[in-house]
């Protein structure tokens, strides 16, 4: 096992990365190694998808399957070895079918790629584990050096994040042939074990640019289906009655669950990254979408154990449900998996509903505590003139984007302290689950504008980017000249690709934490600082002083 993709990876003087029987996330060495094998198979599939395009063959099934299967290898998504093997088998079947179609047009066709003809050596996991050792991500690290290896990981993990957003967009009926072509090109290229520093850096930025377009179609899919988010008050305390908790990012799953639970007397609660759903007009119209439950994903083993109903996981993040003894009432969907728990293959949530009806639910309603969400792209753009007027009249000094992933590291209290320290003449935009560090605090208003603006899920960084672009256009300056600072927390691969997106757009002077990614060497961090001014957080006082200048 070798995995260095998340923020909580093991760090030692000898090197970084989880390399024992189990990773810090709970992923076993078996599952980790099989995921490496799956990635290699998917790189070969992408090589064929590229070759097929030269013959005019575009296979929509492969285009949707490839990023979905890749998504299953993200942190805290799928821990089920059997499911990972099934993805690999399906990938090879799809590749074989595509090769047959290509050879009908050109019988001499070959694909010049080291993984183009990769086959699984057997069906049994012990044999596949032995085969997977060929594809361990650190196999040639000693040969190529830490910097090259780190840049490869930056590209690989960034592409994983983009693949996740591609799948979210696909679920909502959004696709783009050019995006799929770029995805396959980057995926196939990574399978060649690239060694050139400049190419690696350029392609990391290319993956970021591609992801900007992915986030655009995802935003389009969400707003076309459910309307533009509107500022909405959300109760974060329990309401008496039977209950289902839904977590993850998949708004379509939430919509289907709301439809199927109408009239049942079951209340639906959002968790984690599902919180922004309350701002969408077509979702918040359901009266039994009663509120949000819990906090950051890392606290789920305690919070889920106390929830008196079933829990539906639609995407990341899932962690071991056996710790809190709720494994019998957690249900996984789509790419999510945990060995031994219930998995829903289709879109019928009847088993979840039946389980909820058989449970007690919350015995009484607690006193309401309301927070506000729904400051999505259109709402932010509509507020652009107000923001400009406040800046011009010197009533608004600075805007901070403080958000990203949450996690269990104690150093993450920095983000709570930072938000608390933002002066009264400044506002905070936030997004992703990092908001749970401070989103239940009362920040008040500034000239009628809430000082805390919840922009949405991690992919809604797109909304913040579009606001920054509009403000810069109206003010006749660059984004980097705006009174805007980004202070981002990272944990997994979606955060990595959002960072690459921001850098690819030329956004500079981003603060990141709580630690540097384990795969980025001091040399690489120095390059990112030199090119983009990207720097690790220090102390709240020091960073605030550097940003505001006094």
Swiss-Prot record:
Its EC number is 1.7.99.1. Keywords: 2Fe-2S, Cytoplasm, Iron, Iron-sulfur, Metal-binding, Oxidoreductase. It catalyses: A + NH4(+) + H2O = hydroxylamine + AH2 + H(+). Hybrid [4Fe-2O-2S] cluster binds at residues 249, 273, 317, 405, 433, 458, 492, 494. One of its GO terms (biological process) is response to hydrogen peroxide. The modification Cysteine persulfide is found at residue 405. Binds 1 [2Fe-2S] cluster. Its cofactor is [2Fe-2S] cluster; hybrid [4Fe-2O-2S] cluster. [2Fe-2S] cluster binds at residues 3, 6, 18, 25. GO terms for cellular component: cytoplasm. GO terms for molecular function: 2 iron, 2 sulfur cluster binding; hydroxylamine reductase activity; metal ion binding; peroxidase activity. It is found in: Cytoplasm. CDD domains: HCP. It comes from the Bacteria. InterPro entries: HCP/CODH, Hydroxylam_reduct, Prismane-like_a/b-sand, Prismane-like_sf, Prismane_a-bundle. It holds the Pfam family Prismane. Catalyzes the reduction of hydroxylamine to form NH(3) and H(2)O. PANTHER family: HYDROXYLAMINE REDUCTASE. Belongs to the HCP family. This is Hydroxylamine reductase. It comes from Yersinia pseudotuberculosis serotype O:3 (strain YPIII). The gene is hcp.
